[in-house]
Curated annotation (Swiss-Prot):
Pathway: Amino-acid degradation; L-kynurenine degradation; L-alanine and anthranilate from L-kynurenine: step 1/1; Cofactor biosynthesis; NAD(+) biosynthesis; quinolinate from L-kynurenine: step 2/3. The keyword Hydrolase applies. Homodimer. GO terms for biological process: anthranilate metabolic process; L-kynurenine catabolic process; L-tryptophan catabolic process to kynurenine; NAD biosynthetic process; quinolinate biosynthetic process. GO terms for cellular component: cytoplasm. The gene is kynU. This is Kynureninase. SUPFAM superfamilies: PLP-dependent transferases (SSF53383). Keywords: Hydrolase, Pyridine nucleotide biosynthesis, Pyridoxal phosphate. One of its GO terms (molecular function) is pyridoxal phosphate binding. Catalyzes the cleavage of L-kynurenine (L-Kyn) and L-3-hydroxykynurenine (L-3OHKyn) into anthranilic acid (AA) and 3-hydroxyanthranilic acid (3-OHAA), respectively.
Amino acid sequence: MPCFDSVYTKEYAQQLDAVDPLARFRNEFYIDEDSIYLDGNSLGLLSTRAEQSLLDVLDSWKQYGIDGWTKGKHPWFYLSESLGEKMASLVGAKAEEVIVTGSTTTNLHQLVSSFFRPEGKKTKILADELNFPSDIYALKSQLHLQGFDPEEHLIQVKSDNGHLLNEEDIIAEMKEDIALIVLPSVLYRSGQILDMERLTTAAHQRNILIGFDLCHSIGAIPHQLRKWDVDFAFWCTYKHVNGGPGSVAALFVNEKHFGRRPGLAGWFSSNKQKQFDMEHTLTPAEHAGAFQIGTPHIFSIAPLIGSLAIFAEAGIEQIRKKSLKLTDYMMTLIEHELSDYQFTIQNPRDERRGAHLYIEHDEAARICKALKEENVIPDFRSPKGIRLAPVALYNTFKEVWNTIQVLKFIMKEERYKKFKNERDVVA
């Protein structure tokens, strides 16, 4: 560990970078060295390996045409399964329990339509009031399709402070009328990590199925879905996994549920040996592949080939270790350098935080615009939230130090005041 009189100096940050075991991976990403990108929790950066994977798949189309489904470097017909196998270690699952398919929301629709089986008193779904809106839209939609009023049958656990959830409150809502629970692994605003193992155990003790949205944890923190006995999970791949805008999502189904018929069946739900028999009676795949629906979006799945290779080399434990150091260092600097400017850190201070920080300020929208003008890329969340995500694979401690200096300059010089305090179309 570097030894300096003050952790607040640039030299201290540079020494942290000098002993960073993941430093070499930064060179694999396309990075504008004149800017500081801290929005990897919304969209990760492009790596040269992800780029090459996409080019390889394009080349297969060019060379083989229709035969690209079974020929070439990465045959398309098996990509969802082969990438599921590569991603399984990130979630602590067996290869056959993970499939790369669809989008986050379509996968949630698929899983709820497959696992929500109201019977008797059990007619309600338990969620939370801090979840990402799309999940709530999907849950309400599924209740409508089953003939239930979401106002009555969707129970949302309340937050005491608008930032964090109390697991005791969640467990208290696991009542006899709950048939299914869907929760985030990491809250998208505050970055709080929920105790998935504890919640899963509590749910199963009450005969309730439970699934998790891993969008803000996949590629950032380790998971043990099999060990925790989670029933299902789903996630995107364009944030920390660096799959690119609109990259194909993924899902996990615990093997104990293999054989459960998919609620939304389609062409790719089929057992691959039977798929081209063209029978009108579906023979589902015998693994998580049964929960696919349509043809995979090959060009949106291809970058994951290269991206997941980086994760295999870096290791999710090392990524998490550096991530905690980056965010801890950033919090230390915020508290020291910005104490005069009314910022409030709203994410957990302990290791129950994900890979981003969430700070609040009444002028947050304007401050984010001022940061972008200074080539620091943050993320605004209405009404007054700023998310800062130093990514372990490509951000540096020096960038963290520079960011806080830029933020201090913006506040001291009131550079934010020339902007309107409102979000852009894409925040």
